[in-house]
Regions:
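Short, glycine/charge-rich flexible loops or terminal/linker lids adjacent to PRPP-binding catalytic cores
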Residues: 85-124, 132-138
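PRPP-dependent phosphoribosyltransferase catalytic core
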Residues: 2-19, 141-216
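Short glycine-rich phosphate-binding loop at a beta-alpha junction
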Residues: 70-79, 154
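Generic structural signal for helix capping and beta-alpha/helix-loop junctions
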Residues: 84, 107-108, 160, 185
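Active-site-facing substrate-recognition patch
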Residues: 1-68
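Phosphate/pyrophosphate-binding loops at sites that engage ATP/ADP/AMP, CoA/4′-phosphopantetheine
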Residues: 61-73, 143-146
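Conserved acidic residues
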Residues: 73, 121, 151
Length: 216
């Protein structure tokens, strides 16, 4: 996994915290839709309300494309949260645009991908959040099945679990992110939002997320 340079990653982390797209509550944890208890919750859709935030994400994505020498023919967003940022990036790069559903429609032409992906087209997949990587890699496989060549996945935020890194490596798919959970946690401490004890609780969760709830 490739992350933005430290100053850029810190700025994105501060952006997420400022807009409450990422909320951190180690002493009053959240329950995710999966049922897992966690000290953090991420909803990057809150960034859509701010033109400044959207433009900051777009600039970050463009920097990654330049650094990786990516020249996509198509930018494909994951439905639904990846679509706005994919649209912004495609407009900036002057590329085609598509989006990938979580499942094919049950009616009409039963498409999984909306928008054209020509055979052998270079495709960049845009996701807002990477946790386990399952949904992003599912979209990658859908693009590959459609005949596209996936350059990689771009995401705003990743939890940066070891298992996620392994999953992307196994899929032979580069993952580039603007910032990560450890960076957000550090910025939350340096900005006075969290104390050192709370930061340790976050580190404990990141090390063993499945077991964390029983220890707090």
């Amino acid at each position: 996994m490739t992350t933005a340079d430290a100053p850029d990653a810190d700025r994105i982390a501060e952006l997420l915290l400022h807009h409450q797209a990422v909320q951190v509550r180690p002493r009053d944890p959240f329950t995710w839709s999966s049922g897992r208890v966690a000290p953090i919750y991420c909803d990057n859709r809150l960034l859509l309300s701010s033109a400044t935030a959207r433009n900051t994400v777009q600039r970050g994505f463009v920097k990654h494309c330049i650094a990786a020498s990516w020249q996509p023919d198509v930018v494909a967003g994951t439905a639904t949260a990846g679509i706005p940022h994919a649209t912004s990036l495609a407009d900036r790069l002057g590329t085609g645009l598509a989006y990938v559903r979580s499942a094919a429609k049950a009616h009409g032409r039963q498409r999984r991908i909306e928008g054209r992906i020509p055979d052998d087209a270079s495709v960049l997949v845009v996701e807002d959040l990477v946790a386990t990587g399952g949904s992003a890699l599912d979209a990658v496989q859908a693009v590959r099945n459609a005949g596209g060549h996936v350059l990689g996945v771009l995401a705003i935020f990743a939890y940066d679990f070891d298992a996620t890194r392994t999953a992307f490596a196994d899929a032979q798919c580069p993952l580039h992110v603007l910032t990560t959970f450890p960076t957000v946690a550090d910025v939350a401490v340096s900005s006075g939002r969290l104390d050192a004890d709370a930061r340790q609780l976050l580190a404990d969760w990141h090390q063993a997320p499945a077991d964390w709830a029983s220890s707090v």
